[in-house]
From Swiss-Prot:
Component of the nuclear pore complex (NPC). NPC constitutes the exclusive means of nucleocytoplasmic transport. NPCs allow the passive diffusion of ions and small molecules and the active, nuclear transport receptor-mediated bidirectional transport of macromolecules such as proteins, RNAs, ribonucleoparticles (RNPs), and ribosomal subunits across the nuclear envelope. Due to its 8-fold rotational symmetry, all subunits are present with 8 copies or multiples thereof. It comes from the Eukaryota. This is Nucleoporin nup85. Keywords: Cytoplasm, Cytoskeleton, mRNA transport, Nuclear pore complex, Nucleus, Protein transport, Translocation, Transport. The lineage of its organism: Eukaryota, Fungi, Dikarya, Ascomycota, Taphrinomycotina. It is found in: Cytoplasm; Nucleus envelope; Cytoplasm, Cytoskeleton, Microtubule organizing center, Spindle pole body; Nucleus, Nuclear pore complex.
């Protein structure tokens, strides 16, 4: 793919194109050019070499070449990175949750909290589907499928950006501070410290004397991994080397075990959280004061211990020195420096400014879409976050826009030029992309349903052409037509389904479908197709091959009045052969004559009936019978029909032979009547 100087659109180069690169002028000189046909809604089509219009006086077209008989399939790349099963899983969740909508009540803090948690639960459900796919992709890569790596990397960024948005705008838990969600995001984004490093340090003769012991412990504190911090302190060997520190270490372990940020289930209210956190911070400050008074401890050990306490106390300068990037510093500030001032996106934006300001040593790389999304989310700029999410992945953008809009964080931008909201625009584009590149029409339509007018029109235009591979697909399409009151489109769906059934030789079901669709012209066409099949095979339809068709042709009560009327020619010829097979010639003759005398019987098929009549009259059993199997009335009816159609019958020899046999029948009847 490349950009074009002439139009502001991407240009795709087809592989194995009909005309080789550099040969276009040669073909043009022969009066040819390349042409293509696009699928009604898929991003694919066929290319071929075609005659173009030219002036015959100045240019002559060369003779046809074999390459012109070939067609070449092409498709444009999909802009979606998600595998189909993830798109389907999202679609199922989307349909379940779209009807559950909560309107923000801005004057009620309790309602806003409930709203945030509600959409946080929904967000985590969608995001959990990505995690399942990531685990599966990683498993496949471990088994040697290295081509999965690009998809894994892209989806990992999508999941991480989604987790960032969830932590700030709709956390499913942590109602008293957003700091824990932000910390979880960073720990998932960049898992630190590495567990194997910790095992190596703890296996050292005296662990705290390992050169990486204190950096490792500090990292566990910065990441809020207090259980690991406690484990390191207990196994450090500090209290053995310095017994005077035992009481201090035990006190620090007790403080870490009861951190209010990591034990929010015990907290009853916001004020209770604030009280517990201030008490926790005061215990740390007091412990630091006690440690500084120690005089009989190695100064280096004492300094390292104080650094750990400074980190836990939220000392910005000390925390920054132990951080590797702005995300880590930002989350540490939220968790250790200001969890009380970390309750909403506005608070988060202030912490972000602190983490990336002039006094910070960290650089924000705005050229990476994933990082720019997180920057916008942390800066309380949801609209800009959606713009960059769109560039990273359309699936991420549409779901974030939906959640941010419904939770009240994203305004509805509507203008005369764009009369739909940003959310609706993204939903329409996402549905279009899913349909064009993956042909997942059920998924596409599930999203389009949520956009009243535009989505309705798109479904109406596309649903008659969707592939109906099984009964479930057909029922889904019909149910959607019923929901949206698309009566004409439902009839087209049934007609399409009938075509699928006919391709599988399920004619009985196809007739029922066409009858339900009220497509009587198609029903009539299929009827005569069955009529021709029956005559060509010279036998009735078998119930073993199509039980429903056999039932429809054998019992008019199984049909609606309209269906029974339209299929009567095919049903009659079926019954004719059935009676012949069961040696009921008189019954068969009644049906055959009925077809011959049928009003508006297609003249193109009349010769076939004459051949059947000729075969019937010249059947050895019929010729040698003492009881003629054609009633006198039917004989006269046949003669009358032959006289009417004489001018249209080309095979006059056949006509003469039938006349002779019918005349013999009349003689036979008069002879037996006189007796």
């Amino acid at each position: 793919m490349e950009s074009s100087d002439e139009v502001d659109l991407p240009v795709y180069h087809l592989q194995n194109a009909p005309i080789e690169n550099g040969k276009l002028n040669d073909w043009r000189s022969k009066g040819r050019t390349v042409a293509f046909k696009l699928h009604p809604f898929l991003r694919k089509g066929l290319a071929y070499i075609n005659n173009k219009e030219f002036d015959e006086n100045t240019l002559k077209s060369d003779k046809f070449e074999e390459v012109e008989s070939l067609v070449y399939e092409f498709s444009t790349p999909s802009t979606l990175i998600e595998p189909n099963y993830l798109l389907t899983a999202w679609h199922e969740l989307w349909e379940e949750l779209q009807d559950t909508y909560m309107t923000p009540i801005l004057d009620s803090e309790a309602n806003l909290l409930l709203l945030t948690q509600f959409y946080g639960k929904i967000s985590s459900l969608f995001r959990s589907k990505i995690i399942q796919v990531l685990e599966e992709l990683q498993s496949r890569i471990n088994e040697g499928e290295k081509d999965c790596q690009p998809v894994l990397d892209s989806l990992w960024e999508v999941e991480s950006a989604w987790r960032c948005a969830e932590a700030i705008y709709f956390p499913p838990s942590s109602p008293y501070t957003l700091s824990t969600g932000i910390l979880d995001w960073v720990n998932a984004y960049d898992p630190q410290p590495i567990a194997d490093d910790g095992l190596e340090i703890m296996a050292y003769r005296i662990p705290y004397q390992h050169p990486e012991f204190w950096p490792y412990v500090n990292k566990t504190a910065i990441r809020g991994l207090f259980e690991q911090t406690i484990s390191c302190l207990e196994m450090s060997g500090l209290t053995k080397e310095w017994p005077v520190l035992k009481e201090t270490v035990d006190e620090l372990i007790d403080i870490l075990r009861y951190s209010p940020c990591t034990h929010q289930k015990r907290i009853r209210s916001v004020s209770d959280f604030e009280r517990r956190w201030k008490l926790w911070r005061s215990r740390l400050a007091n412990l630091r004061h006690v440690v500084k008074k120690h005089r009989d401890i190695d100064s280096e050990v004492l300094d390292d211990f104080v650094v750990l306490l400074d980190i836990l106390n939220g000392n910005k300068e000390v925390i920054m020195l132990s951080c590797a990037h702005w995300q880590e510093y930002f989350s540490a500030l939220a968790f250790l420096y200001g969890p009380l001032d970390c309750k909403n996106p506005e608070d988060i934006s202030l912490l972000y400014q602190l983490a990336t300001g002039e006094d910070s040593k960290f650089y924000v790389n705005g050229t990476i879409e994933y990082e720019q999304i997180c920057v916008n989310l942390c800066s309380n700029e949801p609209l800009n976050a959606i713009k960059h999410a769109y560039l990273l992945d359309l699936g991420l953008a549409v779901h974030l826009a939906d959640l941010l809009s419904k939770s009240g964080h994203l305004r509805d931008y509507i203008t005369e030029e764009y009369p739909i909201t940003l959310r609706e625009h993204l939903i329409l584009e996402y549905g279009q992309c899913v349909l064009e590149s993956r042909n997942l029409w059920q998924t596409s339509f599930a999203y389009w349903k949520c956009v009243a007018d535009s989505g309705y029109q798109r479904i109406k235009a596309c649903i008659p052409y969707v592939p109906l591979s099984d009964v479930d697909a057909k029922e889904t399409a019909l149910q959607l037509c019923k929901q949206l009151k698309l009566r004409d489109e439902a009839q087209l769906v049934l007609t399409h389904w009938a075509d699928e059934l006919i391709a599988r030789n399920h004619y009985g079901e196809a007739l029922i479908a066409l009858d339900n669709a009220a497509n009587y012209s198609a029903l009539n066409r299929v009827t005569w197709e069955l009529f021709d099949i029956c005559i060509a095979e010279k036998k009735s339809f078998s119930p073993d091959k199509d039980e429903l068709l056999y039932e429809l042709f054998s019992s008019p009560k199984a049909c609606t009045p309209t269906l029974a009327s339209i299929i009567s020619p095919a049903a009659t010829i079926h019954q004719y052969f059935f009676y012949l097979q069961h040696k009921k010639e008189l019954n068969a003759s009644e049906l055959l004559v009925g077809l011959l005398t049928m009003v508006d019987f297609p003249s193109s098929r009349f010769p076939k009936l004459l051949e059947l009549l000729h075969e019937f009259l010249n059947n050895p059993l019929q010729s040698n019978s003492t009881d003629f199997k054609l009633s006198l009335v039917n004989v006269y009816d046949c003669i009358a029909v032959l006289q009417d159609q004489q001018s249209t019958v080309k095979d006059q020899q056949l006509l003469l032979s039938i006349h002779e046999r019918l005349s013999s029948a009349i003689s036979w009847y008069f002879l037996h009547l006189k007796k």
